[in-house]
Amino acid sequence: AVLIFFFVSLILLIGSLFYFNTQKNNVEKTLDISDNIDRIYSKQTELDYYSWKIFDKVVKQGISKGEFVNGLRSELEFYKDVEKGYAVRELEFLERQLVVENVEVSDDKIVLKLNFNLYTDSFGEGLVIDYSYNRELVKEF
């Protein structure tokens, strides 16, 4: 009876250690995914800033509805120095997916409507991010 009790206890101990280790790994994986999501959403403020930065360039190029912003890579070139590997992928996404929906010009202001859609699972772990960014920027004279 003591021997059976010992083996049952040993099996339960090994099982519980395996279970808690699996739970710990799942929590760490969830935290990694959360960090990646936070990183994408934190880019919204930066996108606002850089949208203003390219405002004049976009208007000067005469980009109309539905056209992609040409030369966005050069506008954000410094990203490569700050976050090398991540930046290259992000630049490619931005260059392909930031669209000028419309440009309205009147005597006293210019209105630039931007749309940015990111749909990617490039962060691994089967995570799919579907992120939309829409802004209407107004520059008054």
Regions of interest found by a model, annotated:
Residues L12-F141:
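Long, compositionally biased, intrinsically disordered regions
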Residues A1-L10:
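Glycine-centered recognition micro-motifs in short, flexible terminal segments and loops
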